[in-house]
């Protein structure tokens, strides 16, 4: 779909990124913006739309990194996505940050078996393993990622015990954060943080399958249970 226009944003980690698919071309802005996501993300969105001469109401759908990641970052991303989508009446596509890094591994390194570990602090990682598969449906043939280890928060030891093989491509900050991984020669790669650029392809597949939600259905995914999420005031 050459005419599909998608906007993606991610604030789930210390990286802050936005990306745009417009007329078949992808553009993106990516910054390290620890603790300044709330100040940077809206100007970045304004900039990327202005560079293409677009207004938010000309976007077909909004994708966002729904977690896991830092509590504050995931919450900011969900809140910004909800506000933008509600204001412009946009359908929303939540994207897993772990799967977005797997997509980066495919686009940059042709990896099709990817294990992700984001440092979750407290001697834990956000962890999953996915493989890229061709799928046939009423919407045609496309590729999607299938989980072989479900998204979870776990200790490095628990992650190691679940690994299907040592040959999967490794992404995320978790590998370098804990000695348990390095002792097993499980090192990371050049893909350490999620980037909205690699959410665009995932979002396009979801959009074509009509897998979208409304602004009011947005739910951040923390993978830890002690955090509550408040929707827009008066819309609980």
From Swiss-Prot:
Family label: Belongs to the KAE1 / TsaD family. TsaB subfamily.
GO annotation, biological process: tRNA threonylcarbamoyladenosine modification
Entry keyword Cytoplasm: yes
Protein name listed in UniProt: tRNA threonylcarbamoyladenosine biosynthesis protein TsaB
Annotated PANTHER family: TRNA N6-ADENOSINE THREONYLCARBAMOYLTRANSFERASE (PTHR11735), TRNA THREONYLCARBAMOYLADENOSINE BIOSYNTHESIS PROTEIN TSAB (PTHR11735:SF11)
Pfam families recorded: TsaD
Protein location: Cytoplasm
Domain of life: Bacteria
Chief location bin: cytoplasm
Record keywords, A-Z: Cytoplasm, tRNA processing
GO cellular component: cytosol
Function: Required for the formation of a threonylcarbamoyl group on adenosine at position 37 (t(6)A37) in tRNAs that read codons beginning with adenine. Is involved in the transfer of the threonylcarbamoyl moiety of threonylcarbamoyl-AMP (TC-AMP) to the N6 group of A37, together with TsaD and TsaE; this reaction does not require ATP in vitro. TsaB seems to play an indirect role in the t(6)A biosynthesis pathway, possibly in regulating the core enzymatic function of TsaD.
SUPFAM superfamilies (UniProt xref): Actin-like ATPase domain
Organism of derivation: Haemophilus influenzae (strain ATCC 51907 / DSM 11121 / KW20 / Rd)
């Amino acid at each position: 779909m050459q005419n599909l226009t998608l906007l993606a944003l991610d604030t789930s980690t210390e990286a802050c990124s936005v990306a745009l698919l417009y007329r078949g071309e992808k553009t993106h802005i990516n910054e390290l913006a620890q603790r300044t996501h709330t100040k940077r993300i809206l100007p970045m969105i304004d900039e990327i739309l202005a560079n293409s001469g677009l207004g938010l109401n000309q976007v077909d759908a909004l994708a966002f990194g729904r977690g896991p990641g830092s509590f504050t970052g995931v919450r900011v991303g969900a809140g910004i996505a909800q506000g933008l989508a509600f204001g412009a009446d946009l359908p929303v596509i939540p994207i897993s940050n772990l799967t977005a890094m797997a997509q980066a591994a495919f686009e940059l390194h042709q990896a099709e078996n990817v294990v992700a570990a984001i440092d979750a602090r407290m001697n834990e990682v956000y962890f999953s393993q996915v493989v890229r598969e061709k799928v046939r449906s009423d919407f045609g043939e496309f590729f999607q990622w299938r989980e072989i280890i479900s998204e979870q928060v776990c200790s490095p030891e628990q992650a190691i015990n679940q690994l299907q093989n040592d040959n999967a491509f490794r992404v995320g900050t978790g590998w370098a954060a804990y000695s348990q991984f390095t002792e097993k020669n499980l090192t990371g790669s050049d893909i350490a943080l999620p980037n909205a650029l690699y959410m665009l392809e995932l979002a396009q597949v979801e959009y074509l399958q009509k897998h979208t939600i409304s602004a009011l259905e947005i739910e951040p995914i923390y993978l830890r249970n002690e955090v509550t999420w408040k929707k827009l005031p008066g819309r609980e």
